[in-house]
């Protein structure tokens, strides 16, 4: 989902390690701090009732994908329970909007709260306000209708494989899809990581095709090349901007690529392909990552926020200057403390999203959602 689409939604509503010690400190116009907005640090689930529970006093369980909804609330999915949770940013209360807590692929044609979801990795809203969930272990993408709350499958058969290009998306096979995003024309992109491809669903006629990738999972991805016929080494996560670009994180490739969907070209813009945590204060193209698994484009500062998962950090690369820095995390695994983001340890974060001047992060194995304030 693009930032312009999010703004259109919301307008109508009115709504330190040694390594860290040598990193350049960033200068911001206001105080920068990180705080926990959901979760207690212990995995679990408590029934919320009709009024919800205070998010900071309520356990969550391995949160992954995160996004702001058309109602201005924060939504995130829990990979272990299959639930999608909603946090009201005004009241700070947490409710469940999809998933019954069972890991399975059931419930199409019925209400979202009665459906089972299997390892949801990411969630997005389309421009009509429908919620989309990508399920790694069910090998599908499903939709929760904005009005009826009824669940339906939009891509995948529930069986792992690769088939169906140029035909109906619901008759095509995916293999461990991890990430989804919408491009400006409304089409849905899917990181079909088990097939080494990015798939594209034409949402006007519900057909699927391969946008990029060849299925050669171990082949290196060149620095530049055509989208068609170029191998992708671990296409893990993507986000889009309003200019027709998609930004793709390669997990095994330890790099970020820009996919120009109009010109049909890709280009490496961050990461050398080597594992590491270097390059802060310099060009993103010479930096190193370690198993990056999430990305968000921010129109507010024309930057990419990259979840450097195995480095337990959030990196930011300005698309205007190309410079990269670490904005949250020390490079070592831990749990907090809240406050100074350069001293706050994370534990394998997976999701990131920017909304209303705040960077939200799913600190997955700490079972928390954190908010980074003052960087936008």
Go through each PLM region and give its residues.
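A short loop-to-beta-strand structural motif that recurs across blades of beta-propeller domains
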Residues: 82-86, 139-142, 197-200, 255-258, ...
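N-terminal secretory signal peptides and thylakoid transit peptides that target proteins
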Residues: 1-17
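Short loop/turn segments immediately following the C-termini of beta-strands
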Residues: 79, 136, 193, 251, ...
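Blade-level signature of beta-propeller repeat domains, shared across WD40, Kelch, NHL, RCC1
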Residues: 348-376
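Residue-level detector of Asp-centered blade-edge/turn motifs that repeat once per structural unit
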Residues: 68-71, 125-128, 182-185, 240-243, ...
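Conserved beta-propeller blade signature
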Residues: 73-75, 130-132, 187-189, 245-248, ...
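Gly/Pro-rich loop segments of beta-rich domains
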Residues: 31-62, 92-119, 148-176, 206-234, ...
């Amino acid at each position: 989902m693009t930032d312009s689409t999010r703004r259109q939604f919301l307008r109508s509503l009115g709504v330190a390690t040694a390594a860290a010690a040598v990193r350049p400190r960033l200068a911001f116009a206001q105080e920068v701090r990180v705080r926990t907005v959901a979760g207690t640090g212990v995995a679990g689930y408590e029934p919320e009732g009709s009024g919800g529970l205070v998010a900071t006093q309520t356990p969550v369980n391995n949160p992954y994908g995160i996004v702001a909804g058309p109602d201005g609330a924060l939504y995130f999915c829990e990979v272990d329970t299959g639930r999608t949770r909603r946090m009201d940013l005004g009241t700070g209360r947490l409710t469940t909007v999809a998933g019954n807590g069972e890991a399975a692929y059931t419930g199409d044609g019925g209400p979202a709260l009665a459906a089972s979801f299997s390892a949801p990795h990411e969630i997005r809203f389309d421009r009509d306000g429908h919620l989309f969930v990508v399920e790694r272990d069910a090998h599908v993408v499903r939709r929760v209708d904005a009005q009826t709350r009824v669940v339906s499958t939009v891509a995948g058969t529930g069986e792992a494989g690769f088939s169906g290009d140029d035909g109906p998306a619901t008759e095509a096979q995916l293999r461990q899809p991890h990430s989804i995003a919408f491009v400006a024309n409304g089409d849905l992109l899917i990181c079909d990581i088990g097939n080494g491809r990015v798939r594209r669903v034409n949402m006007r006629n519900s057909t699927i095709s391969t946008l990029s990738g060849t299925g050669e999972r171990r082949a290196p991805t060149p620095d530049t090349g055509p989208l068609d016929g170029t191998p992708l080494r671990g296409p893990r996560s993507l986000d889009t901007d309003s200019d027709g670009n998609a930004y793709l994180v390669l997990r095994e490739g330890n790099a970020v690529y820009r996919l120009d969907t109009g010109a049909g070209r890709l280009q490496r813009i961050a990461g050398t392909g080597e594992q590491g945590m270097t390059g802060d204060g310099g060009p993103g193209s010479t930096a190193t990552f370690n198993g990056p698994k999430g990305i968000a484009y921010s129109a507010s500062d024309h930057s990419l926020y990259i979840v450097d998962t195995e480095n337990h950090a959030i990196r930011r690369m300005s698309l205007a200057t190309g410079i990269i820095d670490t904005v949250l995390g020390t490079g070592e695994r831990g749990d907090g403390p809240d406050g100074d983001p350069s001293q706050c340890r994370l534990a394998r974060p997976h999701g990131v999203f920017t909304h209303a001047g705040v960077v939200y992060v799913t600190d997955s194995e700490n079972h928390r959602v954190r908010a980074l304030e003052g960087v936008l």
